[in-house]
């Protein structure tokens, strides 16, 4: 990834071991790359180390592909306060983004909602306006 010009890598806890996660995180840090550690449930929180400064919670169940936004709210109680939290998948409402921000999330991965629309650019602009509106 680094040789291709990437500035960050995604480590999906469900796809690698804890040892691999730690090894890849250390290597990325040596290469001055950011790491997004993606978790899917409570059982994966033991992948978190002090080296993980960005942690994503994927609301999509990898087995059924069903999304449950409550996962991000539940997992917020288990995440280190000094990390940047990213809520991933299933977000289609600006009010949800506000609620997630209120519990500590700083980033949001929203793709399907915009890509399924006929006007992704226009919908993104409206979505952002709704988020920042008082």
Task: Specify the residue positions occupied by each region the protein language model found.
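Metal-dependent enolase-superfamily TIM-barrel catalytic cores that perform enediolate-based chemistry
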Residues: 4-40, 47
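Catalytic cores of alpha/beta
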Residues: 2-4, 41-51, 87-110, 122
């Amino acid at each position: 990834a680094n040789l291709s010009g990437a500035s960050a890598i995604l480590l999906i806890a469900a796809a690698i071991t804890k040892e691999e996660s730690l090894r890849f995180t250390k290597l990325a840090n040596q290469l001055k790359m950011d790491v997004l550690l993606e978790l899917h449930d409570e059982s994966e929180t033991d992948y978190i180390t002090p080296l993980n400064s960005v942690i994503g919670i994927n609301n999509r169940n990898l087995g059924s592909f069903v999304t449950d936004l409550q996962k991000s709210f539940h997992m917020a109680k288990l995440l280190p306060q000094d990390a940047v939290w990213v809520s991933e998948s299933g977000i289609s409402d600006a009010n949800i983004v506000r609620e997630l921000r209120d519990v500590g999330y700083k980033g949001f991965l929203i793709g399907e909602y915009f890509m399924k629309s006929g006007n992704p650019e226009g919908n993104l602009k409206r979505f952002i306006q709704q988020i920042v509106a008082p």
